[in-house]
């Protein structure tokens, strides 16, 4: 297996001394002032719920970040997409993987991901440690820094699926032809990424600076991905596949740090109720580590789905994740992670 690093071509063009100063100062501002974390994460559990941490939010506005709707006659709002049930064994088998670039289109996608990875590392204060240097102080991540990274990552991760689904929907209307199942899978992916974001927002509320960064990143990314998908959907799906490889790396490292005791505030933190309901988390498996295992499994599934879609003929092939196959005894693409293929299914395997 081969994991990607945060190294990008742009980094080589910046003097080391300047890069160190910029990264330390700029990422520090975001990591420390971008969020207001819940008391159970960064402070003693005996502190009151009204205790305010570093934030730009006025005191009078402190309340649940997104409370349920005030509709007396509505009990709850159901989702159209029910999440598949993962077993603990399946989630623990998820591993870091990398699909080798095989042609110029793959290299374009991979190079773009590496450049974006560098930018995301900068704004979230994350530094990926080389092997054997994980315990050095400059690579240490706190609970607050991890939440900053998770929220920023998930706030833009829901864009590709929505853009792809929207463009394929319009294409189907314009050509007056069926889409053969692509739209549903892409929209469901966007919905899943949004649920990741809503879950993490139950643990920390972004301040004005974080909101500004998300607004700018989402605006640029949406328009850039929109134009790119019009030009080459296949490169875009490969790009998302590589991006999800990075997401698996991020969550894997966070899980390992919890296991190593490096994030003590998360050892007793329970998953929010929104996560328990969405993933159907069983009793006794609702810790912060369990939550990250579920999120990582989702990212691994998106990695497989987009690498698979990137292998297909975008114009005529049906979506293998919405297809019923003639031979049910053989492994085929599905919504679960029982037959997970980290680098995607090849076209000859599914079409």
Swiss-Prot record:
Q: State which Enzyme Commission number(s) the record gives.
A: 1.-.-.-
Homology family? Belongs to the alternative oxidase family.
Q: What does this protein do?
A: Catalyzes cyanide-resistant oxygen consumption. May increase respiration when the cytochrome respiratory pathway is restricted, or in response to low temperatures.
Q: Which cofactor does it need?
A: Fe cation
Q: Which organism is it from?
A: Aspergillus niger
A GO CC term attached to the entry? mitochondrial inner membrane
Which keywords does the record carry?
A: Electron transport, Iron, Membrane, Metal-binding, Mitochondrion, Mitochondrion inner membrane, Oxidoreductase, Respiratory chain, Transit peptide, Transmembrane, Transmembrane helix, Transport
Question: Which positions bind Fe cation 2?
Answer: 193, 244, 299, 302
Q: Principal place where this protein is found?
A: mitochondrion
Q: What is this protein called?
A: Alternative oxidase, mitochondrial
- Record text on cofactor binding: Binds 2 iron ions per subunit.
Determine if Glycosyltransferase is one of this entry's keywords.
no
Binding-site residues, Fe cation 1? 154, 193, 196, 299
Subcellular location as annotated? Mitochondrion inner membrane
């Amino acid at each position: 297996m081969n994991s990607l690093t945060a190294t990008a071509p742009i980094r080589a063009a910046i003097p080391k001394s300047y890069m160190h100063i910029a990264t330390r100062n700029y990422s520090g501002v975001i990591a420390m002032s971008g969020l207001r974390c819940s008391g159970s994460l960064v402070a003693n559990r005996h502190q009151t719920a009204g205790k305010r941490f570093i934030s730009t939010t006025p005191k009078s506005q402190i309340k649940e970040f997104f409370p349920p709707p005030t509709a007396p006659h509505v009990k709850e709002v159901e989702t159209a997409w029910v999440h598949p049930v993962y077993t603990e064994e399946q989630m623990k088998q998820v591993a870091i993987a990398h699909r080798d670039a095989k042609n110029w289109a793959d290299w374009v996608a991979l190079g773009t991901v590496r450049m974006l990875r560098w930018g995301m590392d900068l704004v979230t204060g994350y530094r990926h440690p080389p092997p054997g240097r994980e315990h050095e102080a400059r690579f240490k991540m706190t609970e607050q820094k991890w939440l900053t990274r998770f929220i920023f990552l998930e706030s833009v991760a829901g864009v590709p699926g929505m853009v792809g689904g929207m463009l394929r929907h319009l294409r189907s209307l314009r050509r007056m032809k069926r889409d053969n199942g692509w739209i549903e899978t892409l929209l469901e992916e966007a919905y899943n990424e949004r649920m990741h974001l809503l879950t993490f927002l139950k643990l920390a509320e972004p301040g004005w600076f974080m909101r500004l960064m998300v607004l700018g990143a989402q605006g640029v990314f949406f328009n850039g991905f929109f134009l790119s998908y019009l030009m080459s959907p296949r490169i875009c799906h490969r790009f998302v596949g590589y991006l999800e490889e990075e997401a698996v790396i991020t969550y894997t490292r966070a899980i390992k740090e919890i296991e190593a005791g490096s994030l003590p505030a998360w050892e007793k933190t329970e998953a929010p109720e929104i996560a328990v309901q969405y993933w159907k988390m069983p009793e006794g498996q609702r810790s912060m580590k369990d939550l990250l295992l579920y999120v990582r499994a989702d990212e691994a599934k998106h990695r497989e789905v987009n690498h698979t879609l990137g292998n297909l003929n975008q114009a005529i092939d049906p979506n293998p994740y919405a297809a019923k196959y003639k031979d049910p005894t053989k492994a085929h693409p599905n919504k679960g992670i029982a037959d997970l293929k980290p680098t995607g299914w090849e076209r000859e395997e599914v079409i």
